[in-house]
């Protein structure tokens, strides 16, 4: 009798994706983040579903419905904070996952990489719209400021913004549609993640050396299932600590004040995971220029395969590129810090310098360094 795992139409797909999948024998813990992102997505969809059962997407009741969830619903506070801090864990895993791809040259799998960039945009859109739903001060003003950026688009800008708002300001119509989009987008993300995985399994995983590993493969289960469980345990421990000890650490206290269109908060800033892009937006004094820089700060990932000049795929054997990679990481951390600071000296100039360095590193310095390293190999 044939093994049902290998013959059943559905089990066959699961088997070839998670059980008998041939994986390189030397992939490190940096390869754990794909599975962690899957866990995060499932957790966000489940907690979000239970929150949606009690949430009302109306400007009059949205804030009090969130309060009701935290005070009156059984373990509502737990579900709410798991969802809010789960988003932070999601983005930590996302950034580390993208960083791994940049360091080890995984972007050479073009389809997988480009769908990954699309996924990043989709998750960012989902998180932004989710932040609007509690209808606190930062929700309202964040939505106003960010949607208003679209008015910088020539000719159609103003009409576009009013179309998205469903009126002449952020109001009931905006909140309702944001809730609808926030509910549907995670399922689109899940579908895209399936396609991401499909394209990855066409080529197989990359590995730290960047060399072809076809001659040395091991089955995914039990080796990498066990290895992934360690990552999952660390994720759960970190998230639990955050939720149970300091659930509001990553949030903004202004969001505990109900939305008031007549009162602007002193410092409007998004959640921490958008601060690097927000800093790039603010560092350009022109509105349209800022919006373009904001979009390009993420969209630039799509052209990274074109900028790959090195003879080796991975940075493992390229010490000069390694240094530049860590400078890029430090630069992004600097931008994240600046995004949370008020617009005043010296933060403005630091943000502008960090923004210029960010684009210079990716577009110019790293490709040139790769070419220099190619020459050094001719000794």
Curated annotation (Swiss-Prot):
Q: Name one GO cellular component term.
A: mitochondrial inner membrane
One Pfam family it belongs to = Cytochrome_B
The record's annotation in CDD domains points to: cytochrome_b_C (cd00290), Cytochrome_b_N (cd00284)
Which note does the record give on the cofactor?
Answer: Binds 2 heme b groups non-covalently.
Where, in this chain's numbering, is heme b b562 bound?
Answer: 83, 182
> What molecular function does GO assign, one term?
ubiquinol-cytochrome-c reductase activity
- Parts of the chain that traverse the membrane: 33-53, 77-98, 113-133, 178-198, 226-246, 288-308, 320-340, 347-367
Which residues make up the binding site for heme b b566? 97, 196
- Which intervals of the chain form a coiled coil? none
Q: Any keyword Nucleus?
A: no
Miscellaneous comment in the UniProt entry for this protein? Heme 1 (or BL or b562) is low-potential and absorbs at about 562 nm, and heme 2 (or BH or b566) is high-potential and absorbs at about 566 nm.
Describe, as the record does, how this protein assembles with itself and its partners: The cytochrome bc1 complex contains 11 subunits: 3 respiratory subunits (MT-CYB, CYC1 and UQCRFS1), 2 core proteins (UQCRC1 and UQCRC2) and 6 low-molecular weight proteins (UQCRH/QCR6, UQCRB/QCR7, UQCRQ/QCR8, UQCR10/QCR9, UQCR11/QCR10 and a cleavage product of UQCRFS1). This cytochrome bc1 complex then forms a dimer.
Indicate what this protein is called per its UniProt record. Answer: Cytochrome b
